[in-house]
Amino acid sequence: MGPKDSAKCLHRGPQPSHWAAGDGPTQERCGPRSLGSPVLGLDTCRAWDHVDGQILGQLRPLTEEEEEEGAGATLSRGPAFPGMGSEELRLASFYDWPLTAEVPPELLAAAGFFHTGHQDKVRCFFCYGGLQSWKRGDDPWTEHAKWFPSCQFLLRSKGRDFVHSVQETHSQLLGSWDPWEEPEDAAPVAPSVPASGYPELPTPRREVQSESAQEPGGVSPAEAQRAWWVLEPPGARDVEAQLRRLQEERTCKVCLDRAVSIVFVPCGHLVCAECAPGLQLCPICRAPVRSRVRTFLS
């Protein structure tokens, strides 16, 4: 913006200055008030990520390569979380879905999403894209295509024409949006605090590529969107920490030794094959275990 280290969010207006080491624009900006706060039809924080700034998706047209991938009858890439590849298991993960949630779990599970255990946050089992702040009338397939158009599960299930239609509709909305118009409720928001008590899921890092140039006379809405998603490539320490966290997540929480291979229904938590038979209650959430399903994590 100019003076000192002040910054301006293109959707929520002026933000606090005096940045400290470790401060992140996403944490400073996307607090509880901003979740699902529409600005001229654009939900700025619908696509969510962990507090470490992992990239989850971007609103952009499909590339020719992605179109070719989606046209095939088979999936050339494996799912990010194969343990939730079954629609039945995804639906079972909604056992603690908030009663106030506006979208039925059946629609979300059919669209590839499973519940993370946090509020109304869901993730796609294939592209690992995350969405939250659902409102009455939201269509999971449409939101999937809006935020994560290159998901191959989406392309195989709904087809390229559907994804193109959704992208074109929302591109028109972006084209009529003035990026410098400040909303009335542009007051600074407090940094968000993640909920605890539910095991973190593996988070693949994704590097976003800039695809469209700035429009003459100002910053285009597409440029503004990319400004929130771009992340520097992870360093060696980040990769090492991620691998260590992934190893811990795949270790049985009962014996703390063997790898998990059994998923409990309906809660969706994982334990090893040796510990599973003797458990009637999930050791993580204490929910009754109705059935057990063997799963293979790649």
Curated annotation (Swiss-Prot):
Q: Where is the composition biased (Low complexity)?
A: 186-196
Q: Which residues form a coiled coil?
A: none
Keyword Lipid metabolism listed: no
Q: Name one GO biological process term.
A: positive regulation of JNK cascade
GO (cellular component) term, any one: cytoplasm
Assigned keywords, A-Z: Apoptosis, Cytoplasm, Golgi apparatus, Metal-binding, Nucleus, Protease inhibitor, Thiol protease inhibitor, Transferase, Ubl conjugation, Ubl conjugation pathway, Zinc, Zinc-finger
Q: Where in the cell is it found?
A: Nucleus; Cytoplasm; Golgi apparatus
Q: Enumerate the residue ranges of region (Disordered).
A: 1-32, 176-221
Q: Where on the tree of life does the source sit, at the highest rank?
A: Eukaryota
Which Gene Ontology molecular function entries are recorded, alphabetically?
cysteine-type endopeptidase inhibitor activity; cysteine-type endopeptidase inhibitor activity involved in apoptotic process; enzyme binding; ubiquitin protein ligase activity; ubiquitin-protein transferase activity; zinc ion binding
EC number(s) reported in the record: 2.3.2.27
What this protein catalyses is: S-ubiquitinyl-[E2 ubiquitin-conjugating enzyme]-L-cysteine + [acceptor protein]-L-lysine = [E2 ubiquitin-conjugating enzyme]-L-cysteine + N(6)-ubiquitinyl-[acceptor protein]-L-lysine
The segments annotated as RING-type zinc fingers are 252-286
Substitution effect: C124A: Abolishes inhibition of caspases and anti-apoptotic activity
- Its family? Belongs to the IAP family.
Quote the function comment for this protein.
Answer: Apoptotic regulator capable of exerting proapoptotic and anti-apoptotic activities and plays crucial roles in apoptosis, cell proliferation, and cell cycle control. Its anti-apoptotic activity is mediated through the inhibition of CASP3, CASP7 and CASP9, as well as by its E3 ubiquitin-protein ligase activity. As it is a weak caspase inhibitor, its anti-apoptotic activity is thought to be due to its ability to ubiquitinate DIABLO/SMAC targeting it for degradation thereby promoting cell survival.
Q: How does it assemble?
A: Binds to CASP9. Interaction with DIABLO/SMAC via the BIR domain disrupts binding to CASP9 and apoptotic suppressor activity. Interacts with TAB1. In vitro, interacts with CASP3 and CASP7 via its BIR domain.
- Free-text comment on this protein's domains from its UniProt entry: The RING domain is essential for autoubiquitination.
- What PANTHER family does this protein map onto? BACULOVIRAL IAP REPEAT-CONTAINING PROTEIN 7 (PTHR10044:SF163), INHIBITOR OF APOPTOSIS (PTHR10044)
Q: What is the protein name stated in its UniProt record?
A: Baculoviral IAP repeat-containing protein 7
Q: Which organism is it from?
A: Homo sapiens (Human)
